[in-house]
Structure formats: C-alpha cells, structure tokens
Amino acid sequence: MLLSLHGQSKDALEKTRAGAWEYDVIAPYFKCNMTDITAAIGLSQLKRYPEILHRRRSIIERYDEAFKQYPIQVLNHYDTDHISNGHLYLTRLPGKTREACNQIILQLAEQGIASNVHYKPLPLLTAYKNMGFQMEDYPNSYQMFENEITLPLHTCLSDEQVSYVIEKFTEILRKNQ
C-alpha cells in the first residue's frame, strides 16, 4: 500500500470514514497504483492468458528439444513440482565468460535476433555501487550472470522465427567452441 499512496499510512477509503481524515506519510514513496485504462487492458489480456501460456510452452519445448545435444543449460520451466508461465528462456553456457557471451549476443544481433541477459547483478549497477555494494560479496549472483543469455520468447514469434533462432544460435555456438 505504501508504494501506491506516496507513502501514506491510509488509503482514500479509510480517510472517508467520519473523523478518520488523519494520516501520516511514512516515507517519500511513489504513486504506483494502476490506472483504469491499465486495468482494462489487463482484464483483456487475462482472457487470452491460457492461449499465451500454450504458445510460450510450445516455444519452450521446441527450444528444449533443439538444445539437448549442445552444452547448454536451460532453466527448467515444467516439472512435477512446478509450472512456469514461460516468461523468459534463460540459457547458460558452461565454461563461457561474460565477454564470450557478449560476443555471442552481438553475433545473434547481426542475424537479426534480439537476445538479452537476465539479470545483471545489482552490485554491478551504479546505484548499488554508490551504496557500497561490492560484487565479490555476491559470488553466486555473478556466477549465474557470467554465462547467461536469454533467447527470444514471446507469443508473436512464428514457428519459422523460432526455427531461425534455433538455427542461428546453434550455428554461432558451434563457431565459438
């Protein structure tokens, strides 16, 4: 509640009760509540959610099958204990450095494929460096980041585009062994 009300201790409804106008600002936060338009778009998207999940799962299964024969570790999206919404397709390339992965990302870009990294450890970001965070205090975070590449995974990808990503990613990996 605090983040959505500029740090106020009461919401608007609580302040409308007779004699209950008094409130405090706990900290200088933000006003991040959802607008009516955003809510309407969200409700519309929720109707499509099963279709979105199905398409993402289809892409994930194609990627998983294609990458089985390569030295690629992938985030497990589906198991007996959990089911993912398939938001991201994270790969890890054991033995590769961040610099090597950055080169692979550039080579993918040259082929028209937008890849990413999820996520850069907070101690590498200026705001956190300025607060005194040091990367060496978070070795696991760096280890997860060091050789990670996120491949495209969205419902607008056609089957042909998924095949293209698979083809180019594996081709680039073979060249960079």
Show which residues each predicted segment covers.
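PLP-dependent aminotransferase class I/II
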Residues: 1-177
